[in-house]
């Protein structure tokens, strides 16, 4: 896809971590590497728990309303792949407009 790029990030969730509400400029595929992540993305229903080996998707402009480690005692990790136009700000705080 000309003019687009993929950025791959390793995201660590220490025990009990709750991420801030945010949104992305592009498509996101997230793959859980360790532990379990609770997530809620606008337009995708209620909170859902994803475990090791599972993936979730965020459409461009959707608000990532909940992003937290399901455990208070164990870490969690995921691999986030963001597909966006070159030069885009990948992650922005707050709700999408």
Where do the PLM segments sit?
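Extracytoplasmic
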Residues: 3-8, 24-27, 61, 76-78
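Glycine- and acidic-residue-biased ligand/ion/polar-headgroup-sensing regions
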Residues: 24-44, 52-54
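Extracellular/periplasmic catalytic domains that process cell-envelope and extracellular macromolecules
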Residues: 1, 23, 31, 48-49, ...
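Short acidic-glycine-tyrosine-enriched beta hairpin
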Residues: 2-3, 13, 43-61
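Histidine-centered metal-chelating micro-motifs
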Residues: 18-20, 38, 46, 56-69
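Ligand-binding loop in jelly-roll beta-barrel domains
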Residues: 62-88
């Amino acid at each position: 896809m000309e003019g687009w790029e993929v950025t791959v990030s390793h995201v660590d969730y220490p025990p009990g971590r709750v991420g801030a509400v945010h949104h992305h400029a592009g498509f996101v595929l997230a793959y859980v590497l360790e532990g379990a992540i609770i997530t809620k993305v606008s337009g995708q229903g209620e909170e859902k728990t994803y475990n090791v080996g599972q993936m979730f998707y965020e459409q461009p402009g959707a608000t990532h309303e909940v992003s937290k480690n399901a455990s208070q005692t164990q870490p969690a990790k995921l691999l986030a792949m963001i597909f966006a136009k070159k030069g885009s700000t990948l992650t922005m705080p707050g709700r999408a407009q």
